Amino acid sequence: MAVKIRLKRMGSKRKPFYRIVVADSRSPRDGRFIEAVGYYNPLTNPVDLKLNEEDILNWLQKGAQPSDTVRNLLGSKGIMQKYHEARFAKK
């Protein structure tokens, strides 16, 4: 099972917000997911982004692949840097 960390669209028409979820890559965008690990609201100023860092690092170490947008969001919070440091420190 290929697992992805991606955005699940929520909200109403023209007022989206997103949950950051861990889901099977074959499931639909707004369909079934394994675990919700945060949320992202691009309409607020400043942008509202809340992430469960421990769960995200755990899923990344298990092999979950973030989508391009989620990778950028994780990078802005420094989570990708922590993941790379932990990954290459073991070797």
From Swiss-Prot:
GO term, biological process aspect, one: translation
GO cellular component, one term: cytoplasm
Keyword Protein transport: no
MF terms (GO), sorted A to Z: structural constituent of ribosome
InterPro entries recorded: Ribosomal_bS16, Ribosomal_bS16_dom_sf
Keyword terms of this UniProt record: Ribonucleoprotein, Ribosomal protein
Gene3D superfamilies: 3.30.1320.10
Protein family (similarity comment): Belongs to the bacterial ribosomal protein bS16 family.
PANTHER family per the UniProt record, alphabetical: 30S RIBOSOMAL PROTEIN S16, SMALL RIBOSOMAL SUBUNIT PROTEIN BS16M
Protein name as annotated: Small ribosomal subunit protein bS16
Record organism: Lacticaseibacillus paracasei (strain ATCC 334 / BCRC 17002 / CCUG 31169 / CIP 107868 / KCTC 3260 / NRRL B-441)
